[in-house]
Amino acid sequence: MSIVSYEPKVSDFLNLSKKEEILPKALTRLKTVSISTKDIISVKESETLCDIDLLINVPLDKYRYVGILGAVFTGEWLVPDFVKGGVTISVIDKRLVNSKECVIGTYRAAAKSKRFQFKLVPNYFVSTVDAKRKPWQVHVRIQDLKIEAGWQPLALEVVSVAMVTNNVVMKGLREKVVAINDPDVEGFEGVVDEFVDSVAAFKAVDNFRKRKKKVEERDVVSKYKYRPEKYAGPDSFNLKEENVLQHYKPESVPVLRSGVGRAHTNA
């Protein structure tokens, strides 16, 4: 019984622009595209979670970032085609701790299909430092297949297409500065100022500070605002330093001197 083998084409995952096709690799963002050798997984249990190397033979030491453009999973059932049951295969990024967010893609296949194949496009980069730690895993869960423990009912073959590069930030300040043809200082400063002003984070912080300042001013006014006696509670007579309105500037108080010191008599 032969296992289905598939050699993916780069064009299946990546569409090169006319500029990228003409220009040398050093002048384009695309540095190299490598097709790694296959990684074979044999499922021994009904549920398996194992690491998978999607970057075999990819030159990670020469670059800073690597992206998985696509991966082709080919499965071959090692049981008769009339057997009931199926399998669920999930590709996982084990760096993410949230079980709902770590799943990159999921595929289901019935045992009666005998062989199956699916393509996964993660479409994101990781640093080569993380890539060397093999951040990807495959979770295989066989369902409703009546087979004793210890046997191998399924074989998986994975072939991936990877892209490596030294720069992944394409819309940052670095790209704008490099694009300046005239080495004029004013032109450089203009690009920097325009970029900083356009960043949403700076605007968000500025707006937050303004809102916070207004809220604090309202709190100061309401703190010392006069309230009628009917709203007074049992704790309103507890003198606290923050509840006492203090005046540090002396104020003149008029005194009526007529009648001062004279005894009060009833007419």
UniProtKB/Swiss-Prot annotation:
One of its GO terms (cellular component) is host cell plasmodesma. Disulfide bonds: none annotated. It comes from the Viruses. It holds the Pfam family MP. It is found in: Host cytoplasm, Host cytoskeleton; Host cell junction, Host plasmodesma. Keywords: Host cell junction, Host cytoplasm, Host cytoskeleton, RNA-binding, Transport, Viral movement protein. GO terms for molecular function: RNA binding. Transmembrane segments: none annotated. The keyword RNA-binding applies. One of its GO terms (biological process) is transport of virus in host, cell to cell. Transports viral genome to neighboring plant cells directly through plasmosdesmata, without any budding. The movement protein allows efficient cell to cell propagation, by bypassing the host cell wall barrier. Forms a ribonucleoprotein complex with viral RNA. Binds microtubules and modulates microtubule stability. Can bind double-stranded DNA. Belongs to the tobamovirus movement protein family. This is Movement protein. It comes from Turnip vein-clearing virus (TVCV).
